[in-house]
A protein has these predicted regions:
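ABC ATPase nucleotide-binding domain "signature" loop
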Residues: 117
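Class I (Rossmann-like) S-adenosyl-L-methionine-dependent methyltransferase catalytic domain
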Residues: 1-43, 50-101, 121-125, 139-207
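A conserved beta-strand element that flanks and buttresses the S-adenosyl-L-methionine
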Residues: 110
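Short catalytic micro-motifs in class I SAM-dependent methyltransferases
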Residues: 113-114
Length: 207
């Protein structure tokens, strides 16, 4: 996989700026309502933290957060909000999903429109790390891209049929699985979107 020059702007700045005032996603909001405020370990991971909206929302809800993104601009934005939350812990990592050795245990793993950007050659290992990090009773919340998405021809990204996407959650409790297919805007202009919005829980009795 070709690596980007870390000193060259990524082109994501306009996207981050556009989303600066956006509230947390409805999907993450729905997931947070399902987690007890008295959860014994309020550790969350934000995979592909981007503009930082969901990281901020998690901090506001009292979660300790590990925010991960390959883009330096994203991590700089997230680091800038740290001072506003002295009572919780925020850790940031500038890192590609493909290079993750492991993930720490977490009660909530959020991956907002980010997991499909893992290279297919590394996806199986990465997904195993995500599942292994999820504590019993913990929630995964995020999106996968479907195989009818306009970007599905990009060999550097990972796409799934609905059956394949559902199969990734075998052994987990699927709380919500919604398929969305529509034409709409993207960072590169209008495109056909095909995605799956997922909330899944690791069973509390899972070893």
């Amino acid at each position: 996989m070709q690596r980007r020059d870390p000193d060259r702007p990524s082109g994501w700045e306009a996207y981050y700026a556009h989303h600066t005032e956006r509230p947390i996603s409805l999907l993450l909001g729905a997931a947070l309502k399902r987690l007890s405020p008295q959860a014994s370990r309020r550790q969350a991971i934000d995979l592909g933290c981007g503009s930082g909206n969901e990281t901020r929302g998690l901090l506001e809800a009292g979660w300790d957060v590990i925010a991960i993104d390959q883009e330096r601009e994203a991590i700089e934005r997230v680091n800038a909000i740290r001072a506003g939350f002295p009572g919780v812990c925020l850790e940031t990592r500038t890192q590609q999903f493909e290079s993750l050795a492991t993930l720490p245990a977490a009660s909530l793993i959020h991956a907002g429109m980010s997991i499909p950007f893992c290279h297919p050659r590394h996806f199986e290992k990465f997904w195993a790390q995500v599942r292994a990090a999820l504590l019993p009773g913990g929630l995964f919340v995020g999106q996968l891209f479907g195989n009818r998405d306009d970007w599905a021809g990009d060999p550097s990204r990972t796409f799934h049929s609905e059956a394949q996407a559902r199969g990734l959650f075998q052994g987990l409790d699927l709380i919500s699985f919604e398929a969305h297919e529509y034409d709409g805007p993207s960072l590169r202009g209008s495109k056909h979107w095909h995605r799956f919005d997922v909330i899944a829980r690791r069973p509390a009795s899972h070893a």
